[in-house]
Amino acid sequence: MTRIKYTRADDVCCIVRELVSQGFFPHVNVNKVKCLVSWGTSTRAIARIHGLSSAWIAAGLEPGYVIEVIGERFYKLSKAEMIKTVIHELLHIPYTFSGGLRPHGRLVNGRTVYSIYRRIDFSRLEKCFKTG
C-alpha cells in the first residue's frame, strides 16, 4: 500500500492570496485557508477542497478550508490551468465561510471559472510561479 505524502503548497496559497486580494473572493479569509500538495494518491482529481466539518465547528474550532492539489496531476498543467483549478476550488467556498461547501452547478462551473479568469491581473500572479 502506497503512503500518501502531504507537503505545504506555498505556490497554491500565493495564487489564493492574490485572487482574494484582486477582489474575486472577498468572503474568503486567507488566514483560514491552508494549501497542501499530496503525492502518491490514486485519485483522478486534479485538486479538491476540504471544509472543516460541523462537528469540529461545534467543538469550538473556527471554520476553515484546505485546498489539496494532487502533485502528479496539478504540476503537469499549464500556469493558466493551474490558476483555473484554484479558482474552481475557491468557488466551492460559500459566502458564509461556514466550513461547508457549495456543490457543482449554478455557481461552481466552467463558465464562472472562465468569467473570473479573464479578469485577472496576471502580472500580479507571476510571483507565485517563481522557483528556487
PLM features per residue range, with description:
Residues M1-A80, T96-G132:
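Metalloprotease/metallohydrolase-associated module, dominated by Zn2+-dependent proteases
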